């Protein structure tokens, strides 16, 4: 059975950049997967009244905004289709519309039909973050978060943020296609962030991976006074990893996500590719 990756492009108010195209092609090539891209276009409800129509022309403003969103989506779909063709990757594309506040929900619905989503993040793109949160916590599928502003990293060495938790174990399972292709796996355990059930839990995971024929080693790290997300990403990079695998902590409270510290950090300030799974 062929597997594929979903690449959701946000188009409003800011669009993803062509960097996401390059990252998605690299992931599909590494995993040998097809690409299914979707342009998330804005659908703005017309709540105008007579005064707003006469004074500011609100319906016309809405139509222009939606047209701009569709144009950005078409450009991104065209770019990734052309790149996929050059790389010999099977491609399918579509557009989907949603109200701005529902981009995350729409993306989660779409992601359920694909094996992995590749989501581009940047510090100023709140819609992209909404999509990432929606997919991680609402789709039941893993998401690969790629910072559009950072240089792409190779996946030949992968770090696992390991604390022995359920979500970390889920992330390791979801990352198997990457782990099986990696030259080395670094099991990274931060020992001064929170109580750990077992001082040797990193060594135990590394041994389990090695028993499956993978090259793995366990390392310990100290958070110190750094935010936990910054510590994990920096230490993973220091060990030569181009991908960090970690579990996503969070739950929905009245539609607002309450996130764990590491999860919040990688969504807010990603410095490397992170496979996040809930």
Predicted stretch roles:
Residues 42-43, 81-117, 212-244, 250-255, ...:
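Structural beta-alpha unit
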